[in-house]
Amino acid sequence: MATVTVKLDNLKKLKDAVSKQAQRTVKVGVDSGAFYPNGIAVAEIASYLNYGWTQTVKKQQSKWLGAHGVHMKVGATLNMPARPFFRAAIDAKKQDIAKVTEMAKAVLNNITENTPQKIQKALKLLGALGVEAVRDAINDGYAGNVSFALRSPATLVIYGNLFSGHKTDDTPNQITNRKPLRVEGTLAGSISFEIED
């Protein structure tokens, strides 16, 4: 009687590779190595923009603001409204994200020796989709049906003075765009993704 011996070594390797790829996650966010020219981390500013903040004006801030054309008394309240560009961007692209996720699930249902590479490709596609969504939200000032609060007149005065190179003179403001989240493109350019095990 003839016998057939089947070695399943490669099948186990494939199963392990597929299992490893299927457990990976995609994270979209601000590159931790990105900084503005003044040395402030882009991630720190992104957090303030995304979640907003409120604070009481201190003496030194009152002087600085006054020198830049915004006169606020000590004890006044500064408020920056939340502009939730991360959540709004991802919510606006939910259907596209769901399509890519379904494609990845279909790959898992038809395992071949290319499956790990296909899963990796799907993860990269999800990351690129997330980056594009967040960058678009930053550049456009809205995502889906969520529009972000416009810049305040005080912010325009400060930006106008800072970006025109003026410190305390009374020359006209050069920045008039009230669209939030974008001045020079640093924030949008620092959005990236990584795939984690």
Please report, for each region that a protein language model flagged, where it lies by residue:
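Short, Lys/Arg-rich flexible segments
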Residues: 1-197
